[in-house]
Amino acid sequence: MAELACFCYPHLENDSYKFIPFNSLAIKCMLTAKVDKKDQDKFYNSIIYGIAPPPQFKKRYNTSDNSRGMNYETTMFNKVAILICEALNSIKVTQSDIANVLSRVVSVRHLENLVLRKENHQDVLFHSKELLLKSVLIAIGQSKEIETTATAEGGEIVFQNAAFTMWKLTYLDHKLMPILDQNFIEYKITLNEDKPISDVCVKELVAELRWQYNRFAVITHGKGHYRVVKYSSVANHADRVFATYKNNTKSGNVTDFNLLDQRIIWQNWYAFTSSMKQGNTLDVCKKLLFQKIKQEKNPFKGLSTDRKMDEVSHVGI
């Protein structure tokens, strides 16, 4: 995750802003600079290489002292920064909006995946600039539309029916901020269209998840799509979701947290997010993740979760 101010800076033209991507040498200069505390939140002028991000975002970049940041000296950083600028320059951003836009925290990996989709000549985003920009505006929170299959970050499709597409995420192969844990495995499920879904399609998805992915929990971060994650990573997701929700509430950037379909979501996660929306503390909410919750009556007659051991999926072992 990183703020948009880590990728580009605004230049005032007439009554709106044009966004310009940073170059790696300007960032490198900023990372070595001694800057007064009162100037930490201001864009840094490297004198030689142009404008650089505010020094307060130093930890967002990979250095010898911080291996958790972005690999800003890669060509992928340039591609992501340019793509963000293209999207922001396609709309009008006024002075009253600028601070909110630049402080917005976005998913670096999501944006790298959109670059990969853009460069794939078999992908619809390769052929449609309009759809590409729409996908980026959704990814950076500048559009209120949800991420559907056409505008999704992408990955490897492992399941699809008339209503849903399930993607295996490819973060292990990334250049900008790769997942370093080689045991990482995670999926995302997007809606093919943002419209009511038939029970038949939901039943098909639930059957697939229970049969092939019974070692995973189906959760949501509240943005209109599902995530399929290892049970061992659920607590970490809970911390991130709670922190983001509280931060958005505090800053006034309140967006409706979409709980999604209770028949699909893991019941403990549904309880956690419902409790969070009611304003409870993190400790109170997280206890619900580890409690035995009484199983709701099976909404799909004939669809059982009971399996013999030799029938259980080996995905995720």
From Swiss-Prot:
One of its GO terms (molecular function) is ribonucleoside triphosphate phosphatase activity. One of its GO terms (biological process) is viral genome replication. ATP binds at S107, V108, R109, K188, H221, G222, K223, R227. The keyword Ribonucleoprotein does not apply. Its cofactor is Mg(2+). Disulfide bonds: none annotated. It is found in: Host cytoplasm. The active site is at H225. InterPro entries: Rota_NS35_C, Rota_NS35_N, Rotavirus_NSP2, Rotavirus_NSP2_C, Rotavirus_NSP2_N. Its main location: host cell. GO terms for cellular component: host cell cytoplasm. Its EC number is 3.6.4.-. The keyword Zinc does not apply. Homooctamer. Interacts with VP1; this interaction is weak. Interacts with NSP5; this interaction leads to up-regulation of NSP5 phosphorylation and formation of viral factories. Interacts with host DCP1A, DCP1B, DDX6, EDC4 and EIF2S1/eIF2-alpha; these interactions are probably part of the sequestration of some host SGs and PBs proteins in viral factories. Participates in replication and packaging of the viral genome. Plays a crucial role, together with NSP5, in the formation of virus factories (viroplasms), which are large inclusions in the host cytoplasm where replication intermediates are assembled and viral RNA replication takes place. Displays ssRNA binding, NTPase, RNA triphosphatase (RTPase) and ATP-independent helix-unwinding activities. The unwinding activity may prepare and organize plus-strand RNAs for packaging and replication by removing interfering secondary structures. This is Non-structural protein 2. It comes from Rotavirus A (strain RVA/Human/United States/D/1974/G1P1A[8]) (RV-A). The lineage of its organism: Viruses, Riboviria, Orthornavirae, Duplornaviricota, Resentoviricetes.
